[in-house]
Swiss-Prot record:
Lineage: Bacteria, Pseudomonadati, Pseudomonadota, Gammaproteobacteria, Alteromonadales
Record text on subunit structure and interactions: Tetramer of two alpha and two beta subunits.
Keywords tagged on the record: Aminoacyl-tRNA synthetase, ATP-binding, Cytoplasm, Ligase, Nucleotide-binding, Protein biosynthesis
Any one Gene Ontology cellular component term annotated for this protein: cytosol
GO biological process assignments: arginyl-tRNA aminoacylation; glycyl-tRNA aminoacylation
One Pfam assignment: DALR_1
Species: Shewanella baltica (strain OS195)
Domain of life the protein comes from: Bacteria
Name recorded for this polypeptide: Glycine--tRNA ligase beta subunit
Entry's family note: Belongs to the class-II aminoacyl-tRNA synthetase family.
Length: 689
């Protein structure tokens, strides 16, 4: 079979930078799926993307589908011939349709009878005749929320399309993509190199674009180049560039020929909290801030331009002029905000509605303050600081800085709290109340911060559930799923001795008569339990392990986590499978018992050696297990219980539990009930698979 390399490129107007990678990856995935469906073999496939193009290259693509034999079954032999042995009309019609005579048909014998059959050879179709349609289907399936039309064309795409190129080796594939006829013409950079040129071979794509068109089409190469050059530029001025991957991705999606330059701003702006300056540089201007070895912001930034200029100083000056007014705004807002304390902003919270039925932001901070103090008292944190931080927690939302630069909420609250002379614990809590902000973010670790963060999230959870607006489907306007995961992570990762039932009840109490849903507390608890399952599944914990712990319904998250870890460890023990099966058997036996389960074991009724041995082993372990359960040392407890395997196996081998003698039967049921209860102190291991 012959092979050749395939290139497909779509030349467009500037594509949305935040969607570029996803579009390219989806194009490749969709097209390779088409190749697989068409039974076209290939070695590998990659995607390329730049602001004005999407491309894929397939290596060693088969030039044709493989020939194959298709079995075409006809009528049963019993109905294919009449009494005289002549072909019936049905048989002749089938044969004629397959281009053969009945005599040329083969016979197929199955367990259901004998059939006429024709093994037809189907020649594979040439790849070049399939490419255009497959590429179009791949493009049609791209994730484009708002397609657009251009000119008089009825075709829709994310941006107007100007060129389409499909090359199989050096051969141009005929056809159209999005209404554009395939041609060798490829467009270069807007302002450098050749505006357009013809591509002779699929393998020349990257090199020709780079040399002739001044375009680096390989997205990953462009990204790596920007990162390396930015790091070098920062090092030259004695600093380190803050190169966040999401920003790097966006910048790489904005340029075809990246040129990294360094600029500066007046040192006076460094008096403004660095977070506000960084937000301006990264969020608004797509610049990379530079920090010294001590982590202090330098009066410099690194930016990426899309052109090699004969006068880079002019480009640098232009970018400095652009960023200066934004930094001046931040400076003005900061200086203006400092004139008023956070406490003085409390009355203004009464003008902002949190939720129609749940009151204003002032109502919310009052609840947060009380709940944070309650939590702090249980965890040993400073309750006075927790109450104060809760009260001030939303006041920075009323500052000019946060109104202009919304992502600085909390952070600016921390800075303003320090300027107001609040305690450091209160100041830090102002920032950490929102943690974790996203998956993988850190959680607060300081006691006061934990109390405020938990109070804020629980107040929202209980309040929204309390007015009957729980998340439905994918809709979650109040980000309750994130809040729930945040509650669990904060408690678990800080090993806080908190019970969800108690916390929910207190939050519900603080809402007073606001809540109309009588089942709110139970619904919030169920919601949090469901988040437990999702969180642990994301961490790679087996569903059966999670269900085994959920069966015991522990409502203390730190305790829940200890049980998960213990059961996960138990599964690694050699005895776990046998004991899980035994517990399942025990559960099934006990489930059939009518009325209350017997609990008292009468030693004199233990007549079999195996039941005597099991009872003795349990009696030996129970004094050791009691303190382990009390101290939540579940892993050690299950490790000890794993030692029961041989005794349990022997019991089921030798002992008839459901004996005819009622006293013996009840005694054995009591023994099994006692055995199961030891494991149930941790989890229902009968659910382990």
């Amino acid at each position: 079979m012959n092979f050749e390399n395939l290139l497909i490129e779509l030349g467009t107007e500037e594509l949305p930078p935040k969607s570029l990678r996803k579009l390219a990856e989806s194009f490749l995935a969709n097209f390779t799926e088409e190749l697989t469906k068409a039974d076209l073999a290939f070695s590998s496939a990659v995607w390329y993307a730049a602001p004005r193009r999407l491309a894929i290259k397939v290596t060693e693509l088969a030039l044709a589908q493989a020939d194959k034999v298709v079995e075409k079954r006809g009528p049963a032999v019993s109905s294919a011939f009449d009494a005289e042995g002549k072909p019936t009309k049905a048989a002749e019609g089938w044969a004629r349709g397959n281009g053969i005579t009945v005599e040329q048909a083969e016979r197929l014998v199955t367990d259901k009878g004998e059939w006429l059959v024709h093994n037809a050879k189907v020649e594979g179709v040439e790849t070049k005749s399939l490419i255009a349609a497959m590429a179009q289907r791949a493009l049609d399936k791209l994730p484009i929320p708002k397609p657009m039309r251009w000119g008089n064309n009825k075709t829709q795409f994310i941006r107007p399309v100007h060129t389409a190129t499909m090359l199989l080796g050096s051969e141009l594939i005929e056809g159209e993509l999005l209404g554009i006829k395939s041609a060798r013409t490829v467009r270069g950079h807007r302002f450098m190199g050749l505006k357009q040129f013809e591509l002779a071979h699929a393998d020349h794509y990257l090199a020709d674009l780079k040399e002739k068109g001044k375009v680096i089409a390989d997205y990953e190469s462009r990204k790596a180049l920007i990162k390396a050059d930015a790091e070098k530029a920062a090092a030259k001025i004695g600093g380190t560039a803050d190169i966040e991957d999401s920003l790097l991705e966006e910048v790489a999606s904005l340029v075809e020929w990246p040129v990294v330059l360094t600029a500066s701003f007046e040192e006076k702006f460094l008096a403004v909290p660095s977070e506000a300056l960084v937000y301006t540089m990264k969020g608004d201007q797509k610049y990379f801030p530079v920090f010294d070895d001590a982590g202090k912001l330098l009066p410099n930034f690194i930016f990426v331009t899309n052109i090699e200029s004969k006068d880079p100083a002019q480009i640098i000056s232009g970018n400095e002029k652009v960023v200066r007014p934004r930094l001046a705004d931040a400076e003005f807002f900061f200086n203006t905000d400092k004139k008023h304390t956070l406490e003085s902003r409390l009355p203004s919270l009464e003008t902002v509605l949190f939720q129609q039925q749940l009151g204003t932001l002032k109502d919310k901070v009052n609840r947060i303050s009380a709940l944070a103090a309650f939590i702090a008292e249980q965890t040993g944190a400073n309750a006075v600081d927790a109450a104060r931080a809760g009260l001030l927690s939303k006041t920075d939302l009323m500052t000019n800085m946060v109104m202009e630069f919304t992502d600085t909420q909390g952070t600016m609250g921390m800075h303003y709290a320090r300027l107001d002379g609040e305690t450091e614990a209160v100041a830090v809590a102002m920032e950490e109340q929102y943690k974790p902000k996203f998956s993988g973010d850190t959680v607060p670790s300081a006691g006061v911060s934990c109390a405020v963060a938990l109070a804020d999230k629980l107040d929202t959870l209980v309040g929204i559930f309390g007015i009957g607006q729980a998340p439905k489907g994918a809709a979650d306007p109040f980000a309750l799923r994130r809040a729930a995961i945040g509650v669990l992570r904060i408690i678990v990762e800080n090993k806080l001795p908190l019970d969800l039932v108690t916390l929910i009840a207190k939050a519900q109490e603080l809402h007073g008569t606001n809540l109309s849903n009588a089942n709110a507390a139970e619904e919030v608890l169920e919601f949090l339990m469901a988040r437990f399952r999702a969180w642990y599944q994301d961490k790679g914990i087996g569903v059966d392990v999670i269900l085994a712990v959920l069966a015991r319904r522990p409502t203390r998250p730190a305790d829940f986590d200890s049980r998960i870890n213990a059961v996960s460890h138990f599964r690694s023990l050699e005895a776990s499978s046998a004991l899980a099966a035994a517990n399942k058997r025990v559960s099934n036996i006990l489930a059939k018992v009518e009325g209350a389960l017997p609990t008292t074991i009468n030693a004199s009724l233990l007549t079999e050696a195996a039941e005597q041995a099991l009872a003795a082993k349990l009696n030996e372990l129970q004094p050791q297990l009691a303190p382990l359960f009390a101290n939540a040392d579940y892993q050690q407890a299950l490790t000890l219980l794993a030692g029961l395997r041989e005794s349990v196996d022997q019991f089921f081998e030798d002992v008839m539990v459901m004996a005819d003698d009622e006293a013996l039967k009840n005694n054995r049921l009591a023994l099994l009930n006692n055995l199961r209860e030891q494991f149930l102190h941790v989890a229902d291991i009968s659910l382990l698979q």
